[in-house]
A protein has these predicted regions:
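Extracellular loop-to-transmembrane helix junctions
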Residues: 2-19, 72-102, 111, 122, ...
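Hydrophobic alpha-helical segments and their helix-loop junctions in multi-pass secondary transporters
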Residues: 138-142, 146-157, 162-166, 174-179, ...
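Extracellular/periplasmic helix-exit of transmembrane alpha-helices
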Residues: 208-222, 276-315, 386-390
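Helix-loop-helix module between adjacent transmembrane segments
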Residues: 10-11, 15, 56, 90-106, ...
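Membrane-interface "cap" regions at the ends of multi-pass membrane proteins
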Residues: 10-66, 240, 270
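Membrane-interface loop-to-helix entry segments
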Residues: 5, 9-27, 129, 145-149, ...
């Protein structure tokens, strides 16, 4: 329990100390935000701060801080330390700069910003990667909540394949509506209800877990290295922990969500609460579910091997909350987490493609032109992943590492932004290089031979993969420093204002 409480303290203190430091480095001021300087009535719409905070939390907190940490706590008590440290030093920094740099550049997404800060060549790679990843997010966050609907806790003995597909259809229809209509008409109105349910569900699971905190494992200071070898299947912490637990530590998906809220904020000075603070809250949610996961694995060790995250979640909830109405509320809360990330992932994809094609989104026709093909592709992936016995596992694995590559892209933008302004760029560069190392190591090492059920990778020897990944991270870090310095010397360059000269005139110029 002591290790768990230390982790919680790191998160809370981190917000008030390191979060304040990061805010000072950026330097929010009184300039007009996109919602006030260039409103469009669809995406750049002024909204109250409390709504923005709630929307940001619901957008970023998908199933990662629940199912991801339930699976990730298999690595042992070290998770209670690495999760909050990674959150404060990496994830919250990532989310803050994703939102604030976007706010300074008319609310543009990372692919558009990468044209400005990284160059046209890298931007094409970023655009491809993020588009694919967002489609995968939409598919994963449709299938998982539908599977949670189709559990005994919610439907008793009526669990069936038909019910699962009905749930998929209903969720997918909602996604279309929330992607297509103006943000204040659907998301801005329904999210307060979702937020209230999420808060109640989080409190319920926390109250259910508190009496069992005394069974939690502790970090072993007498034998430090033993903390790195706790996984029952022998998975190495590097890179597997940081791929398994994305949301909670750092998640590239968040960089696609922060710009959505950057378009609706009315002042830069609330950015730390909205972007940095909500990542801290997600970390706290992750800590609660990690504690629950460790408890249920102690009670039922058989769940450590073979049980899916959804299965472990169902058993945990029914065990710590035996009263049916409350256990139903908790599962509904988890479903909300998934749905409120799935809807905005597809909305973000629509905006990303629109920015890079120049299609104005005030037109109903233009929104349909982008939304319909996106949803058709996502539907095909959902159908395939559920018809193939290994389909969802394959989908989840590719989503996991592509999600972390998105984090690298966003941190690259943040590093160059800060370097070009001659500010402390190390706060973004260090987590950027670390996540580059993690994702490169994962891709180079992972394979069905090296890790059961893993996607195809290069399958290199573990130590060889580590060395190459370290070199990759160093090379990227050098490039970012050089790029940032060169931009700082470029005549007419302004990191805080969109400059059409750096683009191919395919992105609508900020007004």
């Amino acid at each position: 329990m002591i290790t768990f409480l230390i982790g919680v303290a790191i998160l809370i203190l981190g917000y008030f100390t390191y979060g304040k430091f990061v805010e000072r480095v950026f330097g929010p001021d009184d300039r007009k935000t996109p919602a006030l300087a260039n409103p469009d009535g669809v995406d750049r719409v002024p909204m109250p701060h409390w709504k923005n905070v709630l929307i940001q939390l619901l957008n970023i907190a998908g199933i990662g801080p629940v199912i991801g940490v339930i699976l990730g706590i298999k690595f042992g008590a070290i998770v209670f330390i690495l999760l909050p440290l990674g959150n404060v030093l990496g994830g919250a920094v990532h989310d803050y700069f994703s939102g604030m740099i976007s706010m300074r550049n008319n609310g543009y997404n990372v692919p558009a910003l990468s044209r400005k800060f990284l160059g046209k060549g890298p931007a094409k790679l970023v655009m491809t990667l993020i588009s694919v990843a967002l489609i995968l997010v939409g598919a994963v966050f449709t299938t998982t909540p539908a599977a949670l609907v189709n559990t005994p806790i919610l439907v008793g003995s009526h669990v069936s394949q038909t019910l699962f597909w009905v749930a998929v259809a209903v969720i997918f229809a909602y996604y279309f509506i929330s992607t297509f209509f103006p943000i204040d008409k659907i998301i801005g109105r329904i999210y307060p209800v979702f937020g209230a349910l999420l808060i109640l569900a989080s409190l319920a699971i926390f109250i259910g877990i508190v009496p069992n905190l005394n069974v939690l494992d502790e970090f072993c200071f007498a034998d430090i290295m033993s903390n790195f070898h706790k996984h029952p299947a022998g998975q190495p912490i590097i890179p597997m922990l940081f791929v398994t637990i994305a949301c909670g530590i750092i998640s590239g998906f968040h960089s696609t969500q922060s710009p959505l809220v950057a378009r609706t904020e009315v002042t830069e000075k609330t950015g730390r609460q909205t972007f940095y603070g909500m990542m801290i809250i997600e970390g706290l949610i992750g800590m609660i579910w990690a504690a629950g996961g460790m408890f249920i694995y102690h009670q039922m060790p058989e769940l450590l091997t073979g049980a899916s995250g959804v299965k472990v979640l169902s058993v945990l909830v029914s065990t710590v909350i035996p009263w049916a109405p409350i256990s139903i509320l908790v599962v509904v809360g988890v479903i909300i987490l998934a749905i409120t990330s799935g809807d905005t992932s597809l909305r973000s994809l629509r905006l990303t493609v629109a920015e890079l094609t120049g299609l104005e989104q005030t037109s109903v026709k233009n929104r349909l032109l982008l939304t319909v093909p996106m949803f058709a592709l996502c539907a095909v992936i959902i159908f395939w992943s559920n018809m193939n016995p290994e389909g969802f596992n394959i989908l989840w694995n590719y989503f996991s590492w592509s999600n972390q590559l998105m984090a690298v892209c966003s941190l690259c933008v943040a590093t160059v932004y800060l370097r070009s302004k001659k500010k402390n760029f190390w706060i973004a560069l260090i987590p950027c290089m670390f996540m580059t190392f993690i994702t490169a190591d994962y891709i180079l090492w992972v394979s069905p031979e090296n890790l059961k059920g893993a996607p195809l990778g290069f399958g290199l020897d573990y130590k060889t993969a580590l060395v190459i990944a370290l070199h990759d991270a160093a090379i990227l870090g050098f490039f970012l420093c050089v790029r940032g310095k060169s931009l700082s010397q470029m005549e007419g360059y302004d990191a805080d204002r969109w400059n059409s000269a750096l683009d191919e005139n395919k992105i609508p110029k900020a007004q």
